[in-house]
Structures are given as C-alpha cells and as structure tokens.
Amino acid sequence: MSKAKIAVFASETGSNFQAIMDAENLPCEVKLLVCDQQNATVIDKARALDVETFVFHAKDYQAKADYEQEIVEALRDRGISWIFLAGYMRMVGKTLLQAYEGKIINIHPSFLPAFPGRDAIGQAFEAGVEATGVTVHFVDEGMDTGPIIEQEAVPVFIDDTIETLQKRVQKLEHRLYPKVIKQLLQK
C-alpha cells in the first residue's frame, strides 16, 4: 500500500512539524511544508529534512482566495491528499476548505471548546482552570470549531508557570498528533 502524501502548514517554530517528521511508522510522506512567514524557523527544519517548502506572503495577494488558490495548485501538483495544520496562524478560507473538504486537520493547545484562538495556554493559565488540554479536530470556517477527533487533558498544577504548562501541553501535542494522523490515514 502506498503512503498518503500530506502537507503540513506551519507559521512559526514547527515543533509539531518536527514531531510528525520524527514519528515512526506513519502511513504518509510529508511532501510539502506551507508557511506564511518567510523567516519562520520551521522552514529551516523542513529544508534540513529535504521537505519541499511553499512560502507565501499574504500581503503580496489582493485576497485570501488568491493565495489559497496558489496553495491548492501546489498541493494538487504534488498529489497531496491531506493537510495537517501545525501552528499555522491563519484562518483557512473557503478556497482550501472546498478543495480539501474533510481532509484538513488542526491541533489546538486547549481542551476545546475552551480557549479557542491564539495564546490558548496563556488564556487557560490566566483563567486559573484546573486542567487544559490538547484537541485534534477537523477544520471548518470557524476559529477552532470543527468536529473534534480526539482530546486529552493536561492538569494545571498550583506551582505551574506558563512555561511549565506549555512544556507539558507541547509534550502531549507531540505524542497525540502523530497518533491521530496514523489513525486517520489507516481508515
């Protein structure tokens, strides 16, 4: 059985991209990294691993649909069947959603529906909750509102700092995302 060809979208450091690349026995090949930040460290990680990169600057386009159409063409040219968002800090628009309906997955550092959007760990910490978590979900037009695939909780300890909590959340992300990717691609 041939491996699925996937793309990973990331905007910053790419720790979840790295976790996907490091995971063993995934039934896929990461064919493309899509990034919207020209100086993101994830680009260097991809290049070091011989993963092709597609880097765009949204301000170079008149509309979201324009750059998303260019992304769709790049994905189709490479036979990409799934998209996995890994710290991609842009909302996915209709052009991508229609082209890859039911095939775009995101990982979010909270136990959704709590703390959607940016700085979810900081939001959870400031709210003083007893637990936060990690959610893997399908992407829809909303902000972290798509159907949930899997979630796991992360306790917030009384002596936690944002940094210690973030480390535990990231550790879970790096374990959970490859596990869910494997499950989805083996269906």
Specify the residue positions occupied by each region the protein language model found.
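N-terminal Rossmann-like dinucleotide-binding module
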Residues: 1-41, 45
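Amphipathic, non-transmembrane alpha-helical secondary structure
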Residues: 18-22, 44, 69-76, 175-178, ...
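Helix-adjacent hinge/juxtasegments
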Residues: 54, 64-107, 112
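Amphipathic, non-transmembrane alpha-helical scaffold segments
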Residues: 10, 64, 68, 166-174
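Donor/substrate-binding cores of folate-linked one-carbon enzymes
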Residues: 23, 28, 36, 89-187
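Short, surface-exposed acidic-centric catalytic microdomains
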Residues: 28-70
